[in-house]
Amino acid sequence: MEEPNHSHQEWKKGGAELLILSLLEQQPRHGYDLSKLIEARSAGALRFHVTTLYPLLYRLEGRGLVQGRWVEKANQRRRRYYSLTAEGRKLLARQRRSWRGFVEAMSQVMGEEHA
């Protein structure tokens, strides 16, 4: 029997920082864009509500891993765009290595060649 989608919540907690940093590596983004992109790329399995996403972005900014800046565009509301800092890139590289090691270990235990 397959687990319901809420089972992804525990995995999301551990991987949220990695997901956000990975998306910001590609280009600066605002919170709503990050939320929708994660949902779309995960086919709806992962969803970040603003009550989860923005506190995470504020913590990352406070730790010097991302930098936020306000951007105003014509006929649009002001949005805060976040970009990865040099320290954020270093942490992202470490987290990716760690994640790959974790996935490999899980695959070996479960007897699967590829996760």
Give a label for each model feature:
Residues 42-78:
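Canonical helix-turn-helix DNA-binding module
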Residues 8-54:
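N-terminal helix-turn-helix DNA-binding core of bacterial DNA-binding proteins
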Residues 74-96:
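Basic, amphipathic "hinge/linker" alpha-helix immediately C-terminal to the N-terminal HTH DNA-binding motif
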Residues 8-10, 57, 113-115:
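Short, contiguous hydrophobic alpha-helices characteristic of membrane insertion segments
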Residues 2, 90-115:
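Amphipathic alpha-helical dimerization/coiled-coil segments
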Residues 1-9:
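Short, intrinsically disordered or compositionally biased N-terminal tails of bacterial proteins
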Residues 22, 36, 58, 93, ...:
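A cross-family signal for key residues in well-ordered alpha-helices
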